[in-house]
């Protein structure tokens, strides 16, 4: 498996997390990943958005340190870095997840 570069948890900033979560599509992605509690492909997370739009959202989520993406063949497997984020910023992500209303 090939892995995409992600920031170390020490480099993750709360302002970057909050910026990443300021978009409704990214909030939905994070909510779905949290609800699933497992790795999900981009196809499983289909939000009826163009592929380029989804790539953009995942790039921002990865840069903020919220999502980890592993490439396995042709699939991009995405997972939420919930435990790491909760350890660095206790309660922040849990509080945000409670506000997400999934369709």
Where are these regions (language model features)?
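Intrinsically disordered, low-complexity regions enriched for glutamine and histidine
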Residues: 1, 54-55, 74
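Generic macromolecular interface patches on structured domains
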Residues: 39-40, 55, 95
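Canonical helix-turn-helix DNA-binding module
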Residues: 43-67
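N-terminal helix-turn-helix DNA-binding core of bacterial DNA-binding proteins
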Residues: 16-50, 72-84
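N-proximal short alpha-helices
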Residues: 2-3, 18, 27, 31-34, ...
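Conserved acidic functional residues
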Residues: 23, 57, 90
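N-terminal leader segment of winged-helix/HTH proteins
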Residues: 1-21, 66, 86, 97
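Conserved segment of winged-helix/HTH DNA-binding domains
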Residues: 13-14, 35, 77-103
């Amino acid at each position: 498996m090939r892995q995409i570069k992600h920031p170390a948890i020490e480099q993750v900033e709360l302002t970057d997390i909050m910026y990443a979560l300021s978009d409704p599509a990214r909030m939905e992605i994070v909510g779905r990943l949290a609800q699933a509690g497992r790795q999900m492909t981009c196809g499983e997370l289909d939000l009826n958005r163009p592929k380029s739009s989804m790539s953009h959202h995942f790039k921002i989520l990865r840069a903020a340190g919220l999502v980890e993406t592993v490439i396995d063949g042709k699939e991009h497997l995405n997972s939420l870095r919930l435990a790491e984020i909760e350890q660095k910023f206790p309660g922040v992500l849990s509080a945000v997840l409670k506000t997400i209303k999934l369709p």
